[in-house]
A protein has these predicted regions:
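Signature aromatic-anchored transmembrane alpha helix within multi-pass, membrane-resident enzymes
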Residues: 1-15
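C-terminal luminal/periplasmic domains and tails of membrane-associated envelope-modifying transferases
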Residues: 10, 16, 20, 27-269
Length: 269
């Protein structure tokens, strides 16, 4: 009897707490309403491919609002890490006003695989820590977590990916008694109660300034042949094509000043 109670009681408590997830508005709707209310149309909001693009289409103050009011370029973390990918990302980050991470779907997978995605892991570390010049927009009550009275269960997608949480303490401890069960399966969190993150570009760093945070990951040749010519105030690619080696494949990627910034077009092997 005691063993049954030990199993059934916590399960029942969590089930009741999880039902409360559906009592509030979905986090993506809450964040969408904030964006429409505070971000001017025409603003550039970069988002992650393979995840949801926000804001959603909805009624705001009696007016139908559309995501197409904003410029929303996609950043694809699953593209194999390379100097070409890094260059395209940094150019886009420098040109964007906000970076949206709708859920832990991408950093929860790429950051946990540093052997394959060393640049992505460093990117999330720098983004979350503010080194890329982006600051987390603190949004009150944007999340909904399983909660029952003073008890809440909050999964830790950041720690599971080996990353420090960028969230303020009140979002990590939404209740007097907060349990952190660790990593939850993606299907349990991404759709029902994701933890969306919106970062604002406050420092307006150049691609060259951001590139210095990644130089040690791009191989031994990076000191002689950087991805960006930092002496060029215009930020153009170095005029003399030179191989920059990826630490995974060690294959050279040759750049010239005339190359297009889209990684799909400028990758040369």
């Amino acid at each position: 009897g005691g063993l049954v109670a030990l199993v059934v009681l916590p399960t029942l408590l969590y089930a009741l707490a999880f039902l409360n997830v559906y009592r509030g508005e979905h986090p993506w709707l809450r964040l969408s309403r904030w964006i429409y209310a505070h971000v001017p149309p025409g603003t550039t909001i970069a988002y992650e491919a393979w995840d949801h693009r926000l804001p959603l289409t909805l009624q705001q103050a009696g007016v139908l609002r559309w995501p197409d009011e904003f410029h929303q370029p996609a950043l694809d973390p699953y593209v194999p890490d390379s100097a070409a990918k890094l260059r395209a990302w940094l150019e886009q980050l420098a040109a964007s006003d906000y970076v949206l991470i709708a859920s832990n779907r991408l950093y929860g997978s790429t950051a946990r695989w540093p052997a394959r995605y060393p640049l992505m892991r460093r990117y999330y570390e720098c983004l979350f820590g503010g080194a890329l010049g982006y600051r987390l927009v603190t949004l009150p009550d944007v999340e909904r977590q399983p909660r029952l009275g003073p008890l809440a269960w909050v999964a830790d997608p950041f720690g599971a990916a080996g990353l420090a949480s960028p969230l303020p303490p009140e979002r990590e401890r939404p209740a007097p008694l907060t349990l952190h069960p660790g990593r939850a399966d993606e299907s349990l969190t991404v759709y029902d109660h994701p933890r969306p993150l919106l970062f604002q570009n406050v420092a307006r760093l150049s691609p060259q300034e951001m590139a210095r945070l990644f130089n040690d990951l791009l191989g031994e040749e990076i000191g002689k042949n950087p991805v960006f010519d930092c002496q060029n105030d215009r930020g153009a690619i170095a005029h003399n094509p030179a191989p920059v080696y990826n630490t995974i494949s060690r294959r050279p990627f040759v750049f010239s000043s005339g190359d297009h910034l889209d990684w799909r077009k400028d990758r040369k092997i």
